[in-house]
């Protein structure tokens, strides 16, 4: 399947969503190529439980991109990225970022390598590893995690990767009062942004945590 094989409403929904997020609709072309590849591989390898391409636009692409206004340039590690979410959409729309896609599942890592090759995406690489086993201490300005663990759990497995003063950006549903209260020593909640994801009902929050 190529992006031309996706139904026209999929492309239209993505373009509307990009406009709502104040992103250039020129990004629709590479995002659709990524989406088409994900749909094709998902039929065989079960990379995501979301199977409808139209739902993938909302729940994967636009949801991932909702955090991009809050990420500065630099080195970013996307922990437990699965098939590359949010890391690949962020790498597409933020070429000044250098993105490491951290994923231990071999099928998902192979898919991401193929996606990076297919998209000729030079500012991203795959690290086929568990986050806690990745030996790159203090190498990153930012960590992202979309559906990995509690804030404390994310810090436990990936906190060593972040430089002092760096930021963890974690996607959450409802405001995570208890998780924020349970942050370990040396980590402070910096900001919480309520996100508006085009087409997605329900609460979404981006929690930004700083490392001392």
Curated annotation (Swiss-Prot):
Keyword terms, alphabetized: Cytoplasm, Methyltransferase, rRNA processing, S-adenosyl-L-methionine, Transferase
Gene Ontology CC: cytosol
Enzyme class: transferase
One MF term in the entry's GO annotations: rRNA (guanine-N7-)-methyltransferase activity
EC code(s) of this entry: 2.1.1.170
Protein's cellular compartments: Cytoplasm
Reactions that this protein is recorded to catalyse: guanosine(527) in 16S rRNA + S-adenosyl-L-methionine = N(7)-methylguanosine(527) in 16S rRNA + S-adenosyl-L-homocysteine
Pfam (any one): GidB
Residues given in the record as S-adenosyl-L-methionine binding sites: 80, 85, 131-132, 146
InterPro entries: rRNA_ssu_MeTfrase_G, SAM-dependent_MTases_sf
Gene3D superfamilies: Vaccinia Virus protein VP39
Keyword Cytoplasm: yes
Superkingdom field: Bacteria
Family: Belongs to the methyltransferase superfamily. RNA methyltransferase RsmG family.
NCBIfam families per the UniProt record, alphabetical: rsmG_gidB (TIGR00138)
Physiological role: Specifically methylates the N7 position of guanine in position 527 of 16S rRNA.
HAMAP family, per database record: 16SrRNA_methyltr_G
PANTHER family, sorted: S-ADENOSYL-L-METHIONINE-DEPENDENT METHYLTRANSFERASES SUPERFAMILY PROTEIN
Protein name: Ribosomal RNA small subunit methyltransferase G
Source species: Xanthomonas oryzae pv. oryzae (strain KACC10331 / KXO85)
Name of the gene: rsmG
